[in-house]
């Protein structure tokens, strides 16, 4: 099995509803997002997929989140914008990509959440 990964970044603000602590208040992150795609076999030119294609797809999703207050966006009006839920949201937006394995969202250098099916 082969796996490849692309990374991209976005900045946004959010607050965690129902959380008792500092993250209940409005705050921001410079998020790093990793998209991992896998394949049992390489394509005819020896690749899982084109990195540029994957970066373009990922950036198209992240552009909708960049410099936004996530709680005000449609999906996150009902779903708490935790790292876990952001990872799932991005995964679902990219679900049409052949071989998608996982999306990992880093909210800091030391803390991340991964969604995979």
Q: What residue ranges belong to the model's regions?
A:
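Charge-rich, low-complexity N-terminal segments
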Residues: 1-117
């Amino acid at each position: 099995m082969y796996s490849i990964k692309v990374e991209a970044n976005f900045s946004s603000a959010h607050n965690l509803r129902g959380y008792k602590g500092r993250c209940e208040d409005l705050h921001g992150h410079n998020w790093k997002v990793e998209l991992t795609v896998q394949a049992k076999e390489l394509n005819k030119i020896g690749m899982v997929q084109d990195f540029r294609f994957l970066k373009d797809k990922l950036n198209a999703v992240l552009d909708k989140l960049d410099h936004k207050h996530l709680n005000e966006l449609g999906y996150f009006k009902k779903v708490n914008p935790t790292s876990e839920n952001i990872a799932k949201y991005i995964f679902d937006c990219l679900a049409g990509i052949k071989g998608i394995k996982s999306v990992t969202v880093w909210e800091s250098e030391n803390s991340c959440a991964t969604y995979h099916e």
